[in-house]
Amino acid sequence: MAKLLSFSDESRSALERGVDALADAVRVTIGPRGRNVVLEKKFGAPDIVNDGDSIAREIELDDPFENLGAKLMQQVASKTKDKAGDGTTTATVLAQAMVREGLRNTAAGASPVELRRGMEKAAAHIVAGLSERSQAIAGDAIRQVATVSSGGDEEVGRMIAEAMDKVSTDGVITVEESKSLATELEITEGMAFDRGYSSPYFVTDADRQVCEFDNPLILLTDRKISTITDLVPVLETVQKSGSPLLILSEEVEGEALATLVMNKSRGVLQVAAVRAPSFGERRKAALADIAILTGGTLISEDKAMTLDKVTLEDLGKARRVTISKENTTIVANDDHRQAVSERVSAIRRELEATESDYDREKLQERIAKLAGGVAVIKVGAPTETELKNRKLRIEDALNATRAAVEEGIVAGGGSTLLQLADSLDALASSLNGDQRTGVEIVQRALTAPIHQIATNAGQNGDVVIAGMRSSGQGFNALSGVYEDLMAAGIVDAAKVVRLAVQDSISIASLLITTEVVIADKPEPPAPAPAGDGDPMGGMGGMGGMGMPGMGGMGMPGMM
């Protein structure tokens, strides 16, 4: 494909226009009085969202060079989302401010490389400052973090705090759509483990990059599955039942994996494969635990059991399964509560008998996974659009709360960023030339989030920042008063703030050192069909579906 090239100031200006286009769409959502953004969908009703990452992913610009700038900003949002689960809008606002200041100084003759070094030194100083300011989360702080991260929704804050209290801060908490209008919390049997899908082609929700099944059947085996032949009988049986299928095994690879992916892509069968957790004998024990939880049978080599003899009765059942790139959560039915209780008792007896510290630790982990249960927040709303928006807010709040448990909390509302900006004075004074300018770029950018929070609340950002500095307190954008935000319960997760700063500095410092931009040359539009006839040419018939059962591919019963 032919390429387009852009050089020097022209290339950087195009990138900046792309950065601004995306950031201006995202920045309106920041703060408790942030606005919503409407996203058109190819099918169905438009989405109304308040989530920076969701907005950023939707943006694609006509100009190829500007689009590259937008794509770089999407990286800021997605990286922060992946690592912290929240803070995407803050990271985007910070990056935009740094890019603008950095390119202005570059155009004035500053060395981009020295600017970058100064910005990186500022980043290290900020990380250290955050660590000093963070406080361990305790008591009511969990509810406060969740409330702030959900846009001030007290009900969500209370519900997340209650969920963490019941299943512990390390427990499994999932968010799903409710069939009623109310948002409810339910504690049920379930388990989570750190294994994700074997192929990204199993994803059912492209926006969130997860695979979700309701009422799936679960095939459990300690075998490695390489060929599809052994699986054909059970796949045909599951297809007739109309249920999704999760395969938990030592590994699914080669021909078997390729065939499953193809059948999933063609809509023949809703299926996903996940490697079983742990290793060796511990893997078999983990699979046996899941079998008890789901009422299934472990198809084990030790018992000379084979996959081609599996029946529907051998498969486990769950209420819901959620699979991400790295984790799998099984929300079980309550049908097997007694069996789970007996299994936990048996593991406790093993725990009492063992003298190995390592074995003791692993047995305790198994007990925690089986007995801890799963907290399910069932989100309800009057309309589908509001339901999606509310679900996104709750997921963000849950992620931010987990981040707060990891690294503690700091004062929210942009006040900690303003304090960190003022603390950079000493670092800037110790440097000379363009490195000092690089620190000052970060220093000015750190005020951008509070400036935008104030603007979204109908206040003058410059006046609010001056008021915060003179009073030594934060600005509560909801009430419009200056107060101690930590005492008022307006707090942020330190991890979210740290990653927002680090990711924004990383992308901005790379962008201002850009000298050449290379983009794909847009292809000319396809010519319109000749004549006034049917542009589809009558479809020419479908020629049959070629899908008797799951036939095709030269294998009995498989596509």
Curated annotation (Swiss-Prot):
Protein name: Chaperonin GroEL 1
Organism of this sequence: Synechococcus sp. (strain CC9605)
Pfam families xref list: Cpn60_TCP1
Xref: NCBIfam families: GroEL, PRK00013.1, PRK12849.1, PRK12850.1, PRK12851.1
Substrates-to-products reaction catalysed: ATP + H2O + a folded polypeptide = ADP + phosphate + an unfolded polypeptide
Family, as annotated: Belongs to the chaperonin (HSP60) family.
Any one GO BP annotation for this protein: protein refolding
GO MF annotations in UniProt: ATP binding; ATP-dependent protein folding chaperone; isomerase activity; unfolded protein binding
Residues holding ATP: T29, I30, G31, P32, D86, G87, T88, T89, T90, G413, N476, A477, L478, D492
Class of this enzyme: isomerase
Major place of residence: cytoplasm
Gene giving rise to this polypeptide: groEL1
Spans annotated as Disordered: 521-541
